[in-house]
Amino acid sequence: MCIRDRLGIATKPVVIGAYTMLKLCRFTGEKKAEDFIGDLTAAYQELLKECQKQQIAWVQFDEPALVRDMDAQDVELFHCLYDAVLQEKGNCRVLVQTYFGDVRDVYQDLTAMDFDGIGLDFLEGKETVRLIEAYGFPADKILFAGLVNGKNIWKNHYEKTLQTVKGLQEKNISVVFSTSCSLLHVPYTLKHETKLPKECSAYFAFAEEKLTELQELGAVSYTHLR
């Protein structure tokens, strides 16, 4: 029996991506990142095979290192890793998630690869909108749009966010509304902050409130922007 049936949970594993993993490693002696490509891709391939056995629909690989400056050698390394890993995705759909910036140095390569979803930061990713306008976004992929700030405690500026959403919808891009990064950076909820003055808390949105913002933005965009 798979995990989904045994626990009644349709989980989505979130794993540090292979490229970011290598970029965080320190190499000693004569070893370098390229020497570990084979072993690392084999490990990620096994992970995807196990996810297929467990009937997992989506697997998320976090690749924040993609927002850093990348040269041709870095882009080639990314290709070497994922061209191999994605061969074993089978029925699993793979989301590559980026955050804390934009992917200007690898956008065209990223969108051409066999990912099913691509997560982009629309807040700290200053070039994200321009990249989509300049190069488009593939019709066969889902854009996980980081529209609600996952790092700070402030409420979302709905009007500004909905303008971004409208631009994406006009391009007929399949969009999932998301936070710009994990919500581990913010407090859990405002519900128990009973000692905060209302004139202050009125401007705050913690983790639970940010999820509500995503729901509200989705409802408004579906109702009024179509």
Task: Describe each model-derived feature in a short phrase.
Residues 1-6, 223-224:
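Conserved small/polar residues in nucleotide/adenosyl-binding loops
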Residues 4, 51, 63, 110, ...:
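Conserved, mostly hydrophobic/aromatic
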Residues 7-33, 183:
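N-terminal small/glycine-rich loop or linker at the start of catalytic domains
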Residues 10-12, 57-60, 93-95, 117, ...:
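Structural preference for beta-strand elements that scaffold enzyme active sites
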Residues 16-20, 64-66, 97-103, 123-125, ...:
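Active-site beta-loop-alpha junctions enriched in small/polar residues
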Residues 75-92, 214:
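Alpha-helix-loop-beta-strand connector modules within alpha/beta enzyme cores
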Residues 109-205, 220:
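Catalytic-face loop-and-helix region of soluble metabolic enzyme cores
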Residues 202-216, 220-226:
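Flexible inter-domain linker/hinge segments
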